[in-house]
Amino acid sequence: MSPTERPRIEGDRELEILAATLEVLGDVGYDRLTMDAVAARAKASKATLYRRWTNKLSLVIDALHHSKGPAHVPDTGTLRGDLMELVCGMGGLADPETVAPFASVLTAIARDADFAEAFRTEVVGPKVAASQQIWERARQRGEVRGDADLSLFEPALAGIVLHRVFVMGEQPTPDLITRVIDQIILPAATRQPAPSH
């Protein structure tokens, strides 16, 4: 039975459990996260957790999905505005609560095929779909050159920002995201490629 088919926990209690899950994930990583640890952090019984989530995979994926916010596709009328709203809004890369557990997520993706599949489908999938819509609308408005391979542009912004955060040690601020959009993404998407020799 999937998490969406299981009974909901009343009131804010479910949100508290999901927040505790992200805290434990950030503290100990996915491999060492247990339902016991989440229950203790959330001051809940394990039975409460198991009534809603079948295992730690379903709990962690639900917590990550919830932290990303609803699958909203911004439509500001410009590619720049849409990218800023998508990446800097709730659940975006400028949200410290979203980025904090990400190191644990990257490790889990590399080590656990079931986690990787669930993460790509449930957590990343809605953001990828939103990004695809944004880029396709930009192409239809003439903001992106016609020969641009949108499948390369869609993940580029997140890839650059996450590299700067996890490899270079920078904070994922709206200023960093603005600079990446204005100095890398938009020029690359609009500039004509150099002729090949």
Task: For each feature predicted by the language model, list its residue ranges.
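Basic, helix-initiating cap at the start of DNA-binding domains
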Residues: M1-K43, A47, S58
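Helix-loop "lid/cap" segments that line or gate small-molecule binding pockets
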Residues: C88-A94, F102-R111, I181-A188
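Short amphipathic alpha-helical segment with a characteristic S/N-K-E followed by hydrophobic residues
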Residues: I17, R32, N55-V60, S67-A71, ...
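Hydrophobic alpha-helical connector segments
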Residues: A71-A100
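Amphipathic alpha-helical packing segments from all-alpha helical-bundle domains
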Residues: G92-A100, S104, D114-Q140
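C-terminal peripheral helix-coil segments that are non-catalytic and often amphipathic
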Residues: M1-T4, E85, G125, A129, ...
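Short amphipathic alpha-helix in the helical subdomain of ABC transporter nucleotide-binding domains
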Residues: E10-R13, V124, G146-E154, T173, ...
